[in-house]
Amino acid sequence: MSRRKLVGLGAATVLGATATGVLAPHAQAAGRVAPQAAAAAPTVTLAFSDPTGLYPVDGDAPATPELLVTVTSPTALNGTVAWSLSARNESPGSGTEPFEAAPATPSTIRIPLGSLGPDYYLVTATVTDSAGTQLLAQTVGFGVIRPTVAGRRPQSVFGMGIRSESTPAITKQIAQRMGVKWTRGIASVQPDTVSPRAGVFWQQPQIDVARAEIADWHEHGIETLGGINYNMSWNVQPGPNGEPLKLYQNRPKDMAAHVEMVYHAIAPLQDLVPNWELWNEPWVHGWTWKTGDAQDYRDMCRMIWERVKPEYPDVNLIGGGSVSYNRDIVYAQGSRDTGYIDGSVNHAYGYPDATQYAMTKTQIKMDKLWSRTNGRAGQWQTELGTATRYNFPDLPAEEAAYGVARTLAPTYLLHMLAGAEEDSPIRIFWFSLSYDKGYSGDDFNIYDAKTKTPRPVVVAYATMTSLLEDSALQEELYPDAKSTWGFLFRGADGRGRAAVYADQLYDGTDEHQSAGYTGTLTLNDAHGIRAYDHLGRRLTDGRASCVTLALKPWETVYFDSDLSPAALRKALTQDAHFDYTTPLHVSPLSFVKPLDSTSTIDVRVENVTPKTLDASLRINPPQGWRVAPRTVPVNGIKPGESRVISFPVIEFEVSEKNRYTVGYDVTVAHRPASRQSGSQTVQVACLPFRHITVGGSASQWNDVVPVTMTSVTAAGDSKSSSFQAAWDDAFLYVRALVEDDLQVSNAAFTVDAYKFPFQADSIQLAFDAAADKTEDLLAGDPHYEKCLRSISHLYVATLATGGRSELHRQLAPGTNYQTFYPTNAVLPTPLGPMDAQQADGTEGRVLVSRDDANRQTRYEIALAWSQLPELAAEVRAARPGSVTRATFAVQVQDAGATGHGATYWTTQAAHPTSGCYNFAPFWGTGAQFTGGRVDTRWGIGR
């Protein structure tokens, strides 16, 4: 997911332009004085004895940092500094120190903070003068970090978005200490520098400046990914109304001139910089490609290729912008001039949901299939990350900062796993680092530029690189266990290393660790295995024979060992014991037919741990119901195995609201203290046989049981939607009544074909209804059921301006999991509007009507069975009285600034599970927080 899609930030991020007024001056505080005397007030600043705020340690030798308190006063001043030191839940030191400040001269007090091991620390200092006036109360952070690998590592995965605004010398020192091995862009290579006007190109003095900059990065052990920073100022295509645009806002006006600039940027530097990113986020009709189309981008890539490659065949051209963009644009099936890149870009901002792994594997497979060089340059994840403001807004600031730190290693590890399994090089650039300057997008800064001090994620990064650099990822240890990710490495010394973390679960947000998998990992043969937490704190020194380690969501535990990779693998799998508080994923399922004497309460039980379990499941039926038996053994359930346990219903009561709460209790054998309880509200979700007329009387739906979905905003505003479905020999019917205060519509497709229907008010109908999904590049992968599953069909209904009802095909066999763009070739199964009107159409019927008075939108859809041929065959072959199971889900999009956004049946009918291509848009699809994968069941009654 693009950061700009995620947070709507401006282009100054890419340009390296400092946003004015973003930050206050360097942190300081004034004493309590009258307003007219404010200019003469004393000032106080905090810093550390090492200006980076980072203290590398080696072996068991501790760091000895000092806090520097500088007081500047117009008159002589004395007082005290009260300080306290904390590291997560520990308080390793505190004290009070006196100070004396000479008049008009900065006076610095050095406060030793003790002997400290690797971790992230916070120092709170309160400075008070002798009169009792508080001059400063501030908390600043620093890191004690493990030693990182020195020198250049061109094959390293560890990159960083290092801001050009930041003071260069100290920023490079910070990056070097963190173990950063790649930076993105060369500050002295700007389009206007390379070609200040048509036909004129830079000369040796400017080239020498660029080469010196690159050499300086190399001196710090850091490689540079070259970047073409958009247009020359004189070569920007005007806007749609002829208005001038900024240099990043549109495609080049003269593409040939742009290609010459790119060639002249690369030619004198290609011996130092072999990899070049062609354009940042070239979203068609978006923020950097405002009037450009998909073919324009493909043309640009081809023209650059044809200009550069004859002379410099070893140069790698890196293109695209996201996995979905690469599939939709760069590799658009059947389109002209596809695949003129050596490697591709993705910007996977957001939580480390397993869909990041799914999408990266897809990215690699596309590159290998469709790049002109089979993706020889690998994958370049040139921006990704999380931020407290956007990803942890409901947590206290300090806790949110630790939340960001937790997400770093899982993000890298998921991408690294995809690269290792597909044998493709990958580089990953966390966004971003600026030591002392603000910029557009600095919510993602890993330093506090106001205080020039690191945040916890800096220590997490250094810990990761110190333990994983110079190591080759061998395999994932728990491919069947949804709770756990384990990554086995072979170090350069041949010894085994590993990283393990428990996954997070979505509970309406991904902020709360309590919602994720929590437990312990016990190693029963731990000799020679050293373990470290995600901030570098050592957990075990390798001398104990048995150790038990805590597992918390996204908190990576690293293992460094004296063992071979095979022996470490055995210690972490065969000889290990996992004890999770929620070892089973328990999901009461929807009823697939109207309630009657043959009904059962069905509960899906999945073992999410890496070990086989014996358990007992007891259910609590809805009020007024009786089932027998209530308790059923679930023995020998293997990792990743899912069973549906049926409880025959003896007595039931029909709910007018079609909502039934089923509770459950699970106990696991040999774990007497372990008890897992919960409940789920389930509904009857079935399609009876009915002849329906789209646009006809509502009474024809009277005896079709509706399902309901509810969305609630943070402010407590609640909206509900109801869905009814039916079928006959010609169509599958859906009727939806959606509460919506304000209708948000696109222009009709015939007016603007670039508008995405799923971004307006709309509903989506998603089906997993094809056994052979030949265009699903991940089918058959060992992790497919864990997190890679995609749907087969997706349809979107929306009301366009002018009262135009539209039904769009977003996905079906033959669409290659692409999204519609007007200048792409027509696919074997066309994307876009279907042949469907209210009264006729070969592919369906559709009527979307708006009731502004009652703030409701009604959707009536008839989908021809020709659009779901495999499901149609099953339904038609079913015996009278039987039920055909269908995997189906709906999504409601309430668009606009005041809308509720997306509401998913998959998150309301069950706990979501990560997948790959599921709901639209396909950028960000498949994550638990975007509906997850479609695996909810419905029944089609005959």
What residue ranges belong to the model's regions?
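Noncatalytic carbohydrate-binding groove/subsite architecture in carbohydrate-active enzymes
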Residues: 294-419
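Substrate-binding cleft and catalytic face of glycoside hydrolase catalytic domains
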Residues: 178-200, 206-339, 349
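Mature N-terminal, pre-catalytic/accessory segment of carbohydrate-active enzymes
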Residues: 34-166, 565-622, 626-689
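Carbohydrate-binding surface patches
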Residues: 479-527
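C-terminal beta-strand-rich structural cap/linker in extracellular carbohydrate-active enzymes
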Residues: 543-580
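Structural preference for beta-rich elements and adjacent junctions enriched in aromatics
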Residues: 652-942
